[in-house]
């Protein structure tokens, strides 16, 4: 289960209008000021440090577990060279507030929002909302067709579901829920897989 924004035939204003009022207003207000949150994008593993620090902060704050720092660095070293995996940061006054790791699939023309984290100060400035809007518009401006939130809770989930808050956040950007069949394996060596 995921949530996908389809860009085909849409411009930035149309994508923005599909977002909830909070996200629309935050983006418009931030875009109209010189002192607002700014963004940087990188495909270099050398820029992974702030993101991994943010993920550790989120893990401690929310009691979740993320991959090791080496996992994220390896993704960037391997896929970043081809501009298929990158990091975006939201800054205010030169300080990183929020960061996100994304992957681009050129065959499906899709950007995937894989991992994101922030420091506590990010909430005060809505940096996470602004960063996700930035990524969505970056994907649109790169000529991609889709932006995949990479996982949401089932649509009928109530507030007790562990992904409820995160899923509500992801859905507030105007995408549509999509359900896939899941992952399947096909054994290639019959003797190894017989029960």
Where are each of the predicted segments found?
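Terminal substrate-recognition subdomain of acyl/acetyltransferases
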Residues: 1-37, 151-195
């Amino acid at each position: 289960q995921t949530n996908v924004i389809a860009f085909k035939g849409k411009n930035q204003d149309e994508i923005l209008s599909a977002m909830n009022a909070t996200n629309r207003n935050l983006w418009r207000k931030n875009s109209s000021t010189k002192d607002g949150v700014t963004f940087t994008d990188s495909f270099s593993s050398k820029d992974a440090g702030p993101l991994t620090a943010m993920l550790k902060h989120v893990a401690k704050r929310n009691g979740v577990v993320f991959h090791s720092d080496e996992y994220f660095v390896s993704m960037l070293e391997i896929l970043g060279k081809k501009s298929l995996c990158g990091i975006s940061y939201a800054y205010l006054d030169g300080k990183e507030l929020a960061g996100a790791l994304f992957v681009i699939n050129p065959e499906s023309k899709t950007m995937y929002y894989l991992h994101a984290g922030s420091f506590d100060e990010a909430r005060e400035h809505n940096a996470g909302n602004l960063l996700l809007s930035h990524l969505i518009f970056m994907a649109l401006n790169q000529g991609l067709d889709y932006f995949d939130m990479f996982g949401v809770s089932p649509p009928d989930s109530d507030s007790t579901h562990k992904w409820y808050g995160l899923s509500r956040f992801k859905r507030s950007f105007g995408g549509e829920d999509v359900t896939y069949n899941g992952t399947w394996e096909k054994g290639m060596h019959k003797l190894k897989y017989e029960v």
